[in-house]
Amino acid sequence: MSDPKLTKAVDSICDQFIVTKSKISQLTEYFIDCMEKGLEPCESDISQNKGLPMIPTFVTDKPSGQEHGVTMLAADLGGTNFRVCSVELLGNHEFKIEQEKSKIPTFFFQDDHHVTSKDLFQHMALITHQFLTKHHKDVIQDYKWKMGFTFSYPVDQTSLSSGKLIRWTKGFKIGDTVGQDVVQLFQQELNDIGLSNVHVVALTNDTTGTLLARCYASSDAARAINEPVIGCIFGTGTNGCYMEKLENIHKLDPASREELLSQGKTHMCINTEWGSFDNELNHLPTTSYDIKIDQQFSTNPGFHLFEKRVSGLYLGEILRNILLDLEKQELFDLKESVLKNNPFILTTETLSHIEIDTVENDLQDTRDALLKAADLETTFEERVLIQKLVRAISRRAAFLAAVPIAAILIKTNALNQSYHCQVEVGCDGSVVEHYPGFRSMMRHALALSPIGPEGERDVHLRISKDGSGVGAALCALHANY
């Protein structure tokens, strides 16, 4: 028999994570407003700008899928791994990829002033050299390589091949990188180890790469579905991009905009940096656990507050803080569990096992997952309540994840471009790809959003694999040395 007080407390907490239809509509409307504000000219201090960052990527074309006969490099600095790959475009929506992935050493995430930008980018350059030695030894020095660099952190991008870091996210704490051009930092280290023939010609992020990769792979022969209109990431972090009309990007230098228009360009990919949506907390659903995690356990308090409710890095931490609170109320006993003193120990993999476990199984998968992750023994009654919490956390995340999708579709009028118009959304990231039911919950929220059930039926959420690799290579394709 479960403790009535514990059950009541858990039910009360779950109620705090409910996102209603009216809240989805309110958030969608506000998101559009923040997009429009973000497209206006920037303040001199970029951190003081209102609205979303809405960073121009200087990518003005989407691939057709027929590009072929060239091999390029891509480097991807994510939140967990650094990856180098070579991409050979074969045409007909096909490509060949060679890649190596290495885990980023933990000391780069520690608050250690002795770790510098040079340490990080030298590490990346050495891994690039190892990759070329292994996979392209015969031409390592004889070939002029174009490289696209996927750097999925907020940057002030001023051209296709230059951008200064605004702030770190995802746990990095290397202070001297902020304000520096990350392309120059990487290129310098490549030059210093003898790879001056590798030219970092395009700076992109994982969302732009996801959109471009999905465009290359998309091959709807009947043209019943429009080419992808949004690229999005729901993994360790979250972000999204889309193609905006040049005439609406008022923050672009007027001369640059006119030059692009004179070249026949009509759109530019905008990196929304939607992880920063509503940092002012005007409308975002907020619990005491969200506030505590932001202020006490995150590396960037006050920033990326949308991301801290949606991304995989934080979902398990929300659960951990709820359990700590229940123990503080003397309603739950964490015993000697390592949960007490280890922030971020609960991963989305652990939550995934809990999410889909069944009562018929006595929630044994939940028991095993909590034992493995946190050395926490639980009763069946406790597991029932923990599963209820997990499902409340994930449902809120998925419902919030639908908001920017709906907002962009409305702002761009993407669902009304042609008769019976349907659109693709290219998605990447461990949460959207692997978390049980996440996409289904997103679709439910889209139907509740202002696009309605009719609009939701015309939206296709497609997993776009290798966006940060293939997409970065595609970004580099037409760039100059």
From Swiss-Prot:
GO terms for molecular function: ATP binding; D-glucose binding; fructokinase activity; glucokinase activity; mannokinase activity. It comes from the Eukaryota. InterPro entries: ATPase_NBD, Hexokinase, Hexokinase_BS, Hexokinase_C, Hexokinase_N. Pathway: Carbohydrate metabolism; hexose metabolism; Carbohydrate degradation; glycolysis; D-glyceraldehyde 3-phosphate and glycerone phosphate from D-glucose: step 1/4. It catalyses: D-glucose + ATP = D-glucose 6-phosphate + ADP + H(+); a D-hexose + ATP = a D-hexose 6-phosphate + ADP + H(+); D-mannose + ATP = D-mannose 6-phosphate + ADP + H(+). Residues 64-204 are annotated as: Hexokinase small subdomain. PROSITE patterns: HEXOKINASE_1, HEXOKINASE_2. Its EC number is 2.7.1.2, 2.7.1.1. Glukokinase specific for aldohexoses. Phosphorylates glucose and mannose, but not fructose. This is Glucokinase-1.
